[in-house]
């Protein structure tokens, strides 16, 4: 798991997300507390439960982006789900328990990758030996057995050197690789994914053990395939499973987006089964329960739950009281200003302007955004948000695409040309649309 300090986490988030300091600090502290808890004595560690977070803010201000970036920083099992995808137990649709099953699958895959990475050097050496055995078959005695000899002879060492330098990469050889198991693809109705997995596992077991298949491959491809095969042999599946379940129980993070969509609004008279029932099903997961997965039983007592919602049609108090109590940390994200839009266009790593400059540079078209041009784009997006529906920073994508449409279309024929995107250019391309509210409502 990540050992970054809260300050380092916030600094990393700052390079991708503009503003929202309170939300960044909250998730940074929550992530660091995961590490702090693991430093405690086992008796005290069992008593320390994570403080779950509820992020509240209008659409397009960075709630989902914080989750995306956090997933990369966490170095722990992480899953992001939409609350609207789930229905109450007993109705057709996905049950909330599938969140934990999917998170466990993520942990298994992650732990397997880490284990294979640790034995990567040994696996690559063994893969090299197998390829050298094909290129330089060992001498055999009259009985067909390999003769005892110096495997690291001068010729073998010479070939190993060439292999490592890539001089043999394009040579084709016949190599025995593990044949993929013949699986049975089963299309299951929603909510029956677990049963489908069990059936598929049963059919795979019936198909027998692992078989090999002779294939003609380039040496560089054979090295990769054989290294994966040897790496899989060097790891213990049972130990992996135990480690993955430990990781998911102690370091797992669940991000539930759009939680406001399963609130029953104060004025709502609907008895929608996918709302309050889903909240009640989420309760046991958030407060701690045991979920059955194909890898074993998984406890959710020490998982961190981060939830978010716009809460435009409902209020946080519309959540059922029990769930409100399980989300003690409330963070309100602020609506973005025109100045924030300006910073979003220039400051983050791989900002929108950088992306367009790089994309059109592939066609040998040089794009330059001036300070007044960027200010005008930001003001235009902010103005459209104010006069129509406020969709936050996502409006910048729409405005930029409209602005760059003509040059993107003609770029192939304009190799070597330059374009300066200044105030005048932005006004000529977007002026009429922004001034005319009816047009901007449908086009921007």
Curated annotation (Swiss-Prot):
Cellular component per GO, a single term: HslUV protease complex
| GO BP annotation list | protein unfolding; proteolysis involved in protein catabolic process
Q: What is its main location?
A: cytoplasm
Which Pfam families would you find in this protein's record?
AAA, AAA_2
Q: What's one GO MF term for it?
A: proteasome-activating activity
Record's subcellular location = Cytoplasm
Keyword RNA-binding appears in the UniProt entry = no
Any keyword DNA repair?
no
Record-linked InterPro entries: AAA+_ATPase (IPR003593), ATP-dep_Clp_protease_ClpX (IPR050052), ATPase_AAA_core (IPR003959), Clp_ATPase_C (IPR019489), HslU (IPR004491), P-loop_NTPase (IPR027417)
Q: Where does ATP bind?
A: 18, 60-65, 257, 322, 394
Alphabetical UniProt keywords: ATP-binding, Chaperone, Cytoplasm, Nucleotide-binding, Stress response
Domain of life the protein comes from: Bacteria
Its job: ATPase subunit of a proteasome-like degradation complex; this subunit has chaperone activity. The binding of ATP and its subsequent hydrolysis by HslU are essential for unfolding of protein substrates subsequently hydrolyzed by HslV. HslU recognizes the N-terminal part of its protein substrates and unfolds these before they are guided to HslV for hydrolysis.
Subunit structure, as described in the record? A double ring-shaped homohexamer of HslV is capped on each side by a ring-shaped HslU homohexamer. The assembly of the HslU/HslV complex is dependent on binding of ATP.
NCBIfam families according to UniProt: hslU, PRK05201.1
The record's comment on protein family reads: Belongs to the ClpX chaperone family. HslU subfamily.
What protein name is recorded for this chain? ATP-dependent protease ATPase subunit HslU
């Amino acid at each position: 798991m990540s050992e970054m300090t809260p300050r380092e986490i916030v600094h990393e988030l700052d390079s991708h997300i503009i503003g929202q300091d309170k939300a960044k600090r909250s998730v940074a502290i929550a992530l660091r507390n995961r590490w702090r808890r693991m430093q405690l004595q086992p008796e005290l560690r069992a008593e320390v439960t994570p403080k779950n977070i509820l992020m509240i803010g209008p659409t397009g201000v960075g709630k989902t982006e914080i989750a995306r970036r956090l997933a990369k920083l966490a170095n722990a099992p992480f899953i992001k789900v939409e609350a609207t995808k789930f229905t109450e137990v007993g109705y057709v649709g996905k049950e909330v328990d599938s969140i934990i099953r999917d998170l466990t699958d993520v942990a298994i895959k992650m732990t397997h990758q880490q284990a294979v990475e640790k034995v990567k050097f040994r696996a690559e050496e063994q893969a090299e030996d197998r390829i050298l055995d094909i290129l330089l078959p060992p001498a055999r005695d009259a009985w067909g057995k390999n003769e005892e000899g110096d495997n690291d002879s001068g010729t073998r060492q010479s070939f190993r050197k060439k292999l490592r330098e890539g001089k043999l990469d394009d040579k084709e050889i016949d190599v025995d690789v593990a044949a993929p198991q013949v699986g049975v693809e089963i299309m299951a109705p929603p909510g029956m994914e677990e049963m489908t997995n069990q059936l598929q596992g049963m059919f795979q077991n019936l198909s027998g053990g692992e078989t090999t298949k002779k294939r003609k491959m380039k040496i560089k491809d054979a090295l990769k395939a054989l290294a994966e095969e040897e790496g899989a042999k060097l790891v213990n599946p049972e130990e992996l499973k135990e480690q993955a379940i430990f990781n998911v129980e102690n370091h797992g993070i669940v991000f539930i987006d759009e939680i406001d969509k399963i609130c029953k609004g104060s004025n709502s008279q609907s008895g929608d089964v996918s709302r309050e029932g889903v909240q009640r099903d989420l309760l046991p997961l958030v407060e701690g329960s045991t979920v059955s997965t194909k890898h074993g039983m998984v406890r959710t007592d020490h998982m961190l739950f981060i939830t978010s919602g716009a809460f435009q049609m409902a209020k946080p108090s519309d959540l059922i009281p029990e769930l409100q109590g399980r989300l003690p940390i409330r963070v309100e994200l602020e609506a973005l200003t025109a100045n924030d839009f300006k910073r979003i266009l220039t400051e983050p790593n791989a900002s929108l302007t950088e992306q367009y400059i790089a994309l059109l540079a592939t066609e040998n078209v040089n794009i330059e955004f001036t300070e007044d041009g960027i200010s005008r784009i930001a003001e235009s997006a902010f103005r459209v948000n104010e006069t129509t529906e406020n969709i936050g920073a996502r409006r910048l994508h729409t405005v930029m695409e409209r602005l760059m449409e003509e040059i993107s279309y003609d770029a192939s024929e304009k190799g070597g040309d330059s374009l300066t995107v200044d105030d005048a250019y932005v006004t000529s391309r977007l002026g009429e649309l922004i001034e005319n509210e009816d047009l901007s409502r449908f086009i921007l």
